[in-house]
Amino acid sequence: MRILLTNNTLSARAGSEMYVYDVACQLKRLGHQPVAYSPELGEVAELLRAAGVPVVSRLTGLDFRPDVSHGHHHVETMTALACFPGVPAVSFCHGSTPWQEMPPRFPRILRYVAVDLACRDRVVREANVPVEQVQMLLNFADMDRFLARKPLPDKPARALLLSNTAKHVDHAAADNYAATVRDACLSRGISLDVHGSTCGNPTSHPEDLFHNYDLVFAKGRTAIEAMAVGCAVVLCDLAGCGSMVTAATFDSLRPLNFGLQSLRLVNTVDTIAAAIDRYSPTDAARVRDRIRQEARLTDTVTTLIHLYEAVMHEQALRPADPSAELLATGAYLQTLDCILKGQNIKPATARA
């Protein structure tokens, strides 16, 4: 199967960029032919190429026609639909607020995938996509890469804050939550290291980094990967603080992607210290075992392959409707025009 994966950038290591990397590499391992497209290339594009996955920054003039498009971000998804007439697509929503994540409406987008409940609500309520076209597919970790660590100590000694939003702990800024996390850790006798692009200390190998720490402050897929290694995880980011992920809270936090909707508290020394106090090596091991069982990259890609096959089959049975596609393109361009002009309107939807 030939799969085109689109993303607004393939530069820095970030959420949807690494999602493309993990999925494309697994597809290739299974004998499929993934190609990644983004107008902005960089480090992640080079990682994909090193893994044998072709990467392009333009779709015109290619000696490649996909069987299906895996679409992240509406501009790139619509570009793929325009460049490859007759090819069906699956549109993915990875964020409940960024404008780039608003899923477009188009006749050949036959399924929509949301990575958590907030994204699902956005697809249904804001983009007006029928519920029967929407599937929630929760995030994952590559368990062959993020191997389980040795058992945690009875008391945590070393903590890691891993986020691209974190500043250096000594940076003088009102929103420097890294300094707040550091102070909370110090109040419990724990040292803290901060890694991420904003603080000038990025990491290329979090799978190795996690093994050096007992406690990790993170959100989203980073939190999932830390759990898979076996670290105790406190949900935390610039937006706020959540709880320690425990066996008791796992079921409520998993559909939220351990993400923004989980960060209900203000980042203060007291709230973060209270989360630290939930540390339990036994409980962290239970969380590790569950996430390793329920959030495997291999299972996710198997589900995606079935989804690709389903939309390809549906598209083969559908008559071509150029008029409907032109109407949908016009409605999309109207929406895009308003976005570019900074107007706050809901996406336009064409109806045949």
Give, region by region, the residue ranges found by the protein language model.
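A charged, aromatic-enriched C-terminal amphipathic alpha-helix characteristic of glycosyltransferases
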Residues: 15, 151-152, 263-334
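Short His-centered aromatic/hydrophobic patch
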Residues: 71-76, 93
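A short, active-site helix/loop in glycosyltransferases that binds the activated sugar's phosphate group
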Residues: 100-101, 110-132, 172, 176
